[in-house]
Each structure stands twice: as C-alpha cells, then as structure tokens.
Amino acid sequence: MIDVPVALLGYGTVGSAVDRLLAENTDDIERATGHRLRVVRALVRDLSKERPEPPADGVLTTDFASIRDDPSIALVAEVMGGIEPTGDYVLELLRAGKPVVSANKQLIAREGAELFHTASEAGVQLRFEASVCAAIPVIKILREALVATTVHRVLGIVNGTTNYILTKMEEGAEYEDALADAQRLGYAE
C-alpha cells in the first residue's frame, strides 16, 4: 500500500464532499489501486467559517505556502473554483512539482494552455476530467483509446450537475428542488 497525502484547495460544498468520499471509500480505492489517499490539508479563506462537514483537526489552513512547500503532499485537488487566485495557486503548485487535479471548468477553459505547458515543463500531471461530464472518463477515452481516430466534434451536455438537474426535472421535480438536492449531495455549489 502506498500512502498518498492529498491537499485540497477549497473546502466548501465540493471540497468537503471530496474529503468525505475519499474517507468513505478508502478501502475500495486502496484495493483497486494499491494507494491510500488521505486529505491532510485544505486551503480555505476563513478558518472561522462554519462547515456542515468539518474536517479532522489541523487540516484547514489559510497558508497556501504550507501546501506548496510541504514535500509530503503528493497530490493537490483544486476545488476552489474561479480564476483568481486559483490560477496562480495551480501554476505555483505545478512549478513546485506537485500534480494537480481540477474540477474547474472556467480555469481550464481560460488558462489551460499555460497550465498544461507548465505541467509538461515541470514533469507533472494536470488532470481535469473531474471538470467534464461528472468525471466520466470522456477525456481519457478521447486522448488514449481513440488516439488513431480523428475526433472532429463532440456534442452533448457534458456537465454532470446539469445532467443531474435535468434528470430530476424529467422525473417531475421543480428546478429549485433539483438544484437544492444537487447542492446537498455536493454536485453543485
């Protein structure tokens, strides 16, 4: 078993859900991958903010450098959203040799070229499948499995939150109720 200390950039709806899901599925993840992922630090703007799912003691920090400069942190999941200061944080992490996973559509769309170039230069990975189609491995299939095929276009709603809300509405739920349910489950902010 390989221990993988993980840091989160953000601990709101999505960050706390990531922490909870990693904790709930630790044994399954370890069995499938041989890796034990555990959240050891989470960057937040306000330590005093009430959180519906508080993390373990000592996990929350307002000090970005404590994540960037900690050699024991093997992976960072960016779940803050937005461009600033998120983009700067991700660039610094990549330059520091830390692999980053991001669910941030806006960041990838706007800053992706620079981020991917920086990751390549640093010899680390920037993974972003969590930002596409509720983390269904669409990007992996397009990049790896269909490497000998030219894909000209992909059409559809490839956003898990939207798909969830539309499915609930198709089942008779009102938009506001479907959105509230998605937020409660950690799918939407």
Model-predicted regions and their roles:
Residues 1-96:
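N-terminal glycine-/serine-/threonine-rich beta1-alpha1-beta2 phosphate-ribose binding loop
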Residues 9, 13, 17, 62, ...:
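Conserved active-site and cofactor/substrate-binding residues in soluble primary-metabolism enzymes
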Residues 19-20, 52-55, 112-115, 137-144, ...:
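Short acidic, glycine/serine/threonine-rich loops at helix termini
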Residues 58-59, 118-121, 144-147, 172:
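Short, hinge-like loop/turn segments at secondary-structure boundaries
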Residues 60-61, 78, 101-103, 126-130, ...:
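General beta-strand structural signal in soluble alpha/beta enzymes
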Residues 80, 85-95, 103-144:
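Rossmann-fold NAD(P)-binding glycine/threonine-rich loop
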Residues 99, 125, 188:
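Residue-level detector of anion-binding/catalytic polar loops
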Residues 144-189:
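Conserved anion/nucleotide-ligand pocket segment
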